[in-house]
């Protein structure tokens, strides 16, 4: 047991560069890769936490109307059902929320439509 304590003390005194070199030499001597184990360990808890953090509702935000405001106003009207004045105010007041609480697929579709009209869009 005293030998193990001595090894622990010796390893604790290593610099980062020395520890990295030790790992490299042990990998070569034993024919293993130390990189595989930490990746597996890091992937396990992250995979378990991912479903909890996965968003189901997204908000489409008009970041900038771009140079072609008329087309963007038309697209905003089609998406939101707003009147001409309300859609114009929304576009000119960018950044503004266009639609909230939508599914990811719908949010991506709305983003494509608005970007095709010349707007800069964010999905949050």
From Swiss-Prot:
Disulfide bonds: none
Keywords recorded for this protein, A-Z: Ribonucleoprotein, Ribosomal protein
SUPFAM superfamilies, sorted: ClpS-like, Ribosomal protein L7/12, oligomerisation (N-terminal) domain
GO biological process: translation
Keyword rRNA-binding: no
CC per GO annotation: cytoplasm; ribonucleoprotein complex; ribosome
Molecular function terms, GO-annotated: mRNA binding; structural constituent of ribosome
Superkingdom of this protein's organism: Bacteria
InterPro entries in UniProt: Ribosomal_bL12 (IPR000206), Ribosomal_bL12_C (IPR013823), Ribosomal_bL12_C/ClpS-like (IPR014719), Ribosomal_bL12_oligo (IPR008932), Ribosomal_bL12_oligo_N_sf (IPR036235)
PANTHER family (UniProt xref): 39S RIBOSOMAL PROTEIN L12 (PTHR45987), LARGE RIBOSOMAL SUBUNIT PROTEIN BL12M (PTHR45987:SF4)
Function field: Forms part of the ribosomal stalk which helps the ribosome interact with GTP-bound translation factors. Is thus essential for accurate translation.
NCBIfam families xref list: L12 (TIGR00855)
Subunit structure of this chain's protein: Homodimer. Part of the ribosomal stalk of the 50S ribosomal subunit. Forms a multimeric L10(L12)X complex, where L10 forms an elongated spine to which 2 to 4 L12 dimers bind in a sequential fashion. Binds GTP-bound translation factors.
Family: Belongs to the bacterial ribosomal protein bL12 family.
Protein name as annotated: Large ribosomal subunit protein bL12
Name of the encoding gene: rplL
């Amino acid at each position: 047991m005293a030998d193990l304590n001595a090894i622990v003390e010796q390893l604790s005194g290593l610099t980062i560069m020395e520890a990295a070199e030790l790992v490299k030499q042990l990998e070569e001597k034993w024919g293993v890769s130390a990189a595989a184990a930490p990746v597996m360990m890091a992937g396990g808890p992250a995979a378990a936490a991912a479903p909890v953090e996965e968003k189901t509702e997204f908000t489409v935000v008009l970041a900038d109307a771009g140079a072609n405001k008329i087309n963007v106003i038309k697209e905003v009207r089609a998406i939101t059902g707003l009147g001409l004045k309300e859609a114009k105010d929304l576009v000119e007041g960018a950044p503004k929320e266009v639609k909230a609480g939508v599914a990811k697929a719908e949010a991506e579709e709305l983003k494509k439509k608005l970007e095709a009209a010349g707007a800069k869009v964010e999905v949050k």
